[in-house]
Amino acid sequence: MNKKPIIAFLYDFDKTLCTTDMQDYTFIPSLGYTPGEFWSIANSFGFENRMDGLLAYMYTMIEECRKKGIRLSRDYLVSCGHAIELFPGVEDWFARINAFGESLGVEIEHYVLSSGLREIIEGSGVSHEFKEIYACEFFYNEEGLASWPKLDVNFTNKTQFVYRINKGILDVAKDKELNASMPDDSKRIPFTNMIYIGDGLSDVPCIDRKSTRLNSSHGEQSRMPSSA
């Protein structure tokens, strides 16, 4: 029996599925900052040290929690996802599009490619809908506290995860397998079967057809907010 074709939906998260940056709902207020104050600290630190912006915000999270006596554990960050506010229609979108795909004889899969935090996304009400969540993530020491960036997902770095989905090499530790040559007919999901939904600058490399060959409409409209 022939296998069903697979259609993959790839989503940014902040300001695409939820209404603002995911740290803004609970994490930043717990430090006693407004979002503007926290991001100003993180961005200034990054500029002053010529640091990747995402690594700068992750470092700032660790340092500010240390100063305020907050245990930056995995469980704490997951709990910060409980307050995420999704855009109207997002929660039931997955069931609706899955049913539509089934009616057409295709299998639908959902993936996140986000510059936010995997742990916070896992605490949201829709995390169970995704086959894989690719987002920034911390490594935790023997005391259970965030001590080092485990994964950083930004800009052109996001495109590697499109290729992982294309080849079916989802484990981020399997770089050798990802970079090995693979015939097109062996790739699990063709680029032409992917739909990317994003809102910001960090999404541009993924939707640039020269980079990933994902489908795009000639009539599409792009909007570029101030942050990704």
Regions found by a protein language model. Name each.
Residues 2-142:
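Alpha-helical substrate-recognition element adjacent to the catalytic core
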Residues 18-20, 205, 221:
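Conserved protein kinase catalytic core
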Residues 81, 85-111, 115-213, 217:
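C-terminal cap/substrate-recognition subdomain and adjoining C-terminal extension
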Residues 214-228:
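Positively charged, low-complexity/disordered segments
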